[in-house]
Regions:
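Short glycine-/Asp-/Thr-/Trp-enriched loop segments that recur within the blades
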Residues: 12-21, 79-82, 191-192, 259-266
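Asp-box/WD-like beta-propeller blade repeats and closely related beta-sheet repeat scaffolds
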Residues: 1-26
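Hydrophobic beta-strand segments that make up the repeating blades of beta-propeller
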Residues: 30-34, 98-100, 209-211, 278-281
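C-terminal low-complexity, Ser/Thr- and acidic/Pro-rich disordered "stalk" regions positioned immediately N-terminal
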Residues: 296-318
Length: 343
């Protein structure tokens, strides 16, 4: 740390899921949102005072030059808990609503039946606003007791279960599907299981949320490995699809053959807008950067391109891509390895 650096939040070490997502609010200056994932001991996530599996907001404007750091476990505003690993966090540019994308668990069984192929679903969760209202804040989103349904047909004893409702992995006297549905906060939208959303960014007018899906590792037929959008109502800051929707995602860019994933696929991770309104996307598996820019021309349904073998280092600027990719574009243009491909 440099001479002018200081610790503003402490006490959030984990043995597992060690990354921390930080969001600086543009609607409420001075606020920082911090997402902290779970630990090895699942039971600890059921205790609010543990500070695990939580998203909290802190007002840095309240810190003076002699203030002690905020204690993550006891300070700040609780936006939500029971969140296993909400890596992507974003603020709606119009309403200031805070959203996160949740990576749910793997290897789920129920009543001795393996249901992990299509359950539980990944989640888009809403956490209220950073202004004076506390509506939709502080709720328990279920982990590690309750999870979101994606495919109810795969779940034994599924009466009353629909897409997006909460279900109990193991029902007993203290936790049932009914308790999960009534006492825990369900996601605003649910996505297919194991897609692994790692980032979310809104466009400037708040009409679309772009989500980077890193892709599955625990599924017979790989899913994810894509950049997708969710349509929003800019005025309300709400998704246009209902919470039970199975069609909320529209793929913008995806690998052409998921059967060869993850070894021969790009895997989206981080997203960032630049001053020209272009969306930059990183792929950790291939060390590459994509740049997407909207076009005013009439969109085509799909477009694809074959990338020649790179002649330099895989992560060198301007090198061509080593993988064949397909882009599903809606009025967009794609820059790949320095080459602009109009879609």
């Amino acid at each position: 740390m440099g001479a002018t650096s200081r610790v503003v939040i402490n006490n959030m070490s984990n043995n597992d899921l060690v990354t921390r997502t930080l969001l600086i609010s543009q609607k409420q200056p001075g606020f920082i949102v911090v997402s902290r994932g779970g630990n090895n001991n699942l039971d600890e996530a059921t205790v609010l005072s543990s500070g695990l599996s939580q998203i909290r907001a802190f007002n840095l404007a309240n810190l003076t030059s002699i203030s002690k750091p905020y204690d993550f476990e006891t300070s700040g505003r609780l936006l939500g808990w029971g969140l296993r690993n909400s890596v992507g966090v974003a603020e709606h540019p119009v309403t200031g609503g805070i959203y996160s994308v949740e990576n749910s668990i793997d290897g789920v069984t129920r009543q001795g039946t393996d249901i992990h192929e299509n359950n539980p679903g990944e989640e888009l969760n809403f956490h209220g606003y950073l202004n004076d209202t506390t509506d939709h804040q502080g709720g328990n989103y279920g982990f590690p007791r309750c999870f979101a349904v994606w495919d109810p047909n795969e779940i034994p004893d599924n009466a009353g279960l629909t897409v997006g409702t909460q279900f109990a992995m193991t029902e007993n006297s203290t936790i049932t599907d009914e308790i999960c549905a009534s006492n825990y906060t369900s996601p605003r939208l649910t996505f297919p299981a194991h897609q692994a959303p790692l980032d979310i960014k809104f466009n400037a007018d708040g009409s679309e949320a772009y989500i980077a899906f890193h892709g599955s590792f625990d599924k017979t037929n790989p899913v994810g490995y894509s950049l997708s959008i969710v349509a929003f109502d800019p005025a309300t800051g709400e998704p246009t699809e209902a919470a039970s929707s199975t069609t909320a995602l529209s793929d913008i860019m995806t690998n052409p053959d998921h059967k060869v994933c993850p070894d021969k696929c790009f895997r989206p991770v981080g997203l960032a807008w630049d001053s020209k309104g272009r969306l930059w996307m990183s792929s950790d598996s291939t060390g590459e950067i994509y740049v997407l820019q909207k076009s005013t021309s009439t969109p085509t349904a799909t477009a694809s391109g074959t990338i020649v073998t790179a002649t330099g280092k895989p992560n060198a600027a301007g090198t061509a891509w080593q993988k064949s990719t397909s882009a599903l574009c809606y009025g967009a243009a794609l820059v790949v390895g320095g080459l602009l491909m109009a879609m």
